[in-house]
Every structure is written in C-alpha cells, then in structure tokens.
C-alpha cells in the first residue's frame, strides 16, 4: 500500500458506481469499500444519479456492449463523463471507453492483444506510485494500439501501452482488483475526491 490517503477518510464519503452488467464488478466493489468509498452497482441510467465517480470493470466486451445497448446506457455514460466526473476502465472497461465504442477516451484498443493463447500473466509495471511497481495481472488483455495527443501514457509492457489517462478518465489493460494491491484504485479515488472538491 502507498501513503495515499484513503478517499473518504476526511470529509463526506464519496459515492462510486461500478458498472454491473457483466464482469468482475464485485471484486472492484470490495476494493473500493475497503478504501472508504460508498459503492453502488450500476445497471440502468438512474443508477448513475448522485455518483461522484464510475468504474467500468473487466469482463467480455461484446457482452458488455450488448448490455449497454439493452439498458440504453451509452448516452448517460457519455453525459456522466461530460460532467467532469472521473471514470476508471479496466481491461474490457478500457475497450468500452475507446473511440470505437463509447468514444469517451481518444484511444483505439486492440482486443486480446497479447494473444488468446496467453490466458493470463503478471508483470510489475511502474505507474509512479509510492511503494514502487504494481504487480499487474493481465487476462486475455488488450493494449492501446493508438492514441490522440491529449492522452498521457502511464505504462507500457513490451513496448505496448497498457495504462493511460485523458482528463478525468483513467484506463488500464490489467486487473488491479485481483492482485491485492489497492494503490491503483486509491489513485482513482483520489481523483474522484479532487474532482468533487473542485466542483464544490
């Protein structure tokens, strides 16, 4: 764990939604609660109301796309982003946020980029967080194949971008909810708290 303060440790508790149509949303909720956030599972547009931040978890991107279409969530998700509230996308969540899907982040994701035969692997990556590298777990992961000038690349694996930030949006190709290291979620929650303070 880093020396980052747990959001919610001071002041009013922040509320973070986790898109819960499919994928590893429960594990994200556990980490967020451990760090002091109030968590709501998001399945329909009304669930976005009153949230300070949102997580799009890993899972199966085609299934997630169908769920977003079925529940008419695409425009509400874009509006949530337009309001300046932070969003965190992991693995399939990164794919959902790219140009070819929700169009929220100026990136193009390459699905299953490390090869379908490589089901999972773990490597240390440097994100500039206190405490040193993060043990990043990749499961049939994408990478960022292309990005616009406003996108900051935060980490690479074998020369391929696997973590990035654009404005209030953080995306990673790995599964930070699985490794037992809460620092990436803490980084996101700090941005949520900062955004809420700025909007106050």
Model-identified regions with their sequence ranges:
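C-terminal and late-domain segments of enzyme folds
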Residues: 1-10, 143-200
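Pocket-forming structural segment of enzyme catalytic cores
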Residues: 100-160
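Cofactor-binding loop segments of dinucleotide-utilizing enzymes, especially the Rossmann-like FAD-
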Residues: 21, 92, 174
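Structural motif
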Residues: 55-57, 88, 138, 171-173
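N-terminal beta1-alpha1 cap of cysteine-dependent amidohydrolase-like domains
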Residues: 1-70, 79, 182-200
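Cysteine-nucleophile active-site neighborhood
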Residues: 60-126
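Conserved beta-strand segments of alpha/beta enzyme cores
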Residues: 38-40, 135, 152, 170
